[in-house]
Structure formats: structure tokens, C-alpha cells
Amino acid sequence: MAAPSGSVNCEEFAEFQELLKVMRTIDDRIVHELNTTVPTASFAGKIDASQTCKQLYESLMAAHVSRDRVIKNCIAQTSAVVKSLREEREKNLDDLTLLKRLRKEQTKLKWMQSELNVEEVVNDRSWKVFNERCRVHFKPPKNE
């Protein structure tokens, strides 16, 4: 699933996480998808498994690229906010409200960065399952 049209709200981490959860639906359902669309040997003649695997491959690639873009975009936005708050903090060391905002943004940035690790695990799992079922029917392009 691609990201919703328009820009992604990176301000609230809970919304960011919810968006990623929705965008990871294809990965969460890959086993079911493969079981219902890629035939076993006994049903091989009834469905074009190579076309089905190709379509699933393209959907997975699009979802992974889209999520990677969303995560990295939010990391960049939050990093810019942290940088700005640090600069303000250097000018005004006594402002406790500013310090709290800085700490909050730094924490959010760390959580967003950890989503890159989660993404790697999710992607690896999906490709492992995909390759187990589709390697006989479809060979992905070498450049991807």
C-alpha cells in the first residue's frame, strides 16, 4: 500500500506509527496472499503463478520503497527541528520549556530511526517468504 496522497504528518509519532502500520499491511498478509494466489504443484495448471508472483513482487517493491521514503523524510524533518532547537537552546540556556521540547524531539527522532531497523526486519521476512514460494515461478530483475 502506498502512502496516502499529500504530505505525511511527522509531528505526532503515534500518527507516524499508525501510518506505517497501515502501509505494512501487504507484508503482514504475505503468507496468506501467497497461499491463496500461488498454486501448489497439484493446482499448477489452473493459475499463472509467474504472473501472480510478478504482481506480488511489484506490490512489495512499491510498498517497501514508499515506506522507506516516508521514514527517511520524517527523520529528515525531525532532525531539522532538533537542529533548530539546539541552536535556540545554545542562545538561551535557562529556558526549561525549550529544553523539554528539545528532549521530546530528540526522543521522537530516535524512535523514527528505530523504525528503519523495524523496516529492515519486516522487509527481510517478506522477501524470505516470497522467495520460498515464488523462486520457481518468477525471477526478480538483477538490478533491484
Swiss-Prot record:
Positions carrying N-acetylalanine are 2
Q: Transmembrane residues, as ranges?
A: none
Q: Which domain of life is it from?
A: Eukaryota
Question: Which segments does the entry list as coiled coil?
Answer: 82-120
Family (UniProt): Belongs to the MIX23 family.
The record's listing under InterPro entries reads: MIX23
| Keyword list, A-Z | Acetylation, Coiled coil
Residues annotated as carrying N6-acetyllysine in the record are: 100
PANTHER family registered for this protein in UniProt:
COILED-COIL DOMAIN-CONTAINING PROTEIN 58, PROTEIN MIX23
| Stated name of the protein | Protein MIX23
Recorded GO cellular component terms are:
mitochondrial intermembrane space; mitochondrion
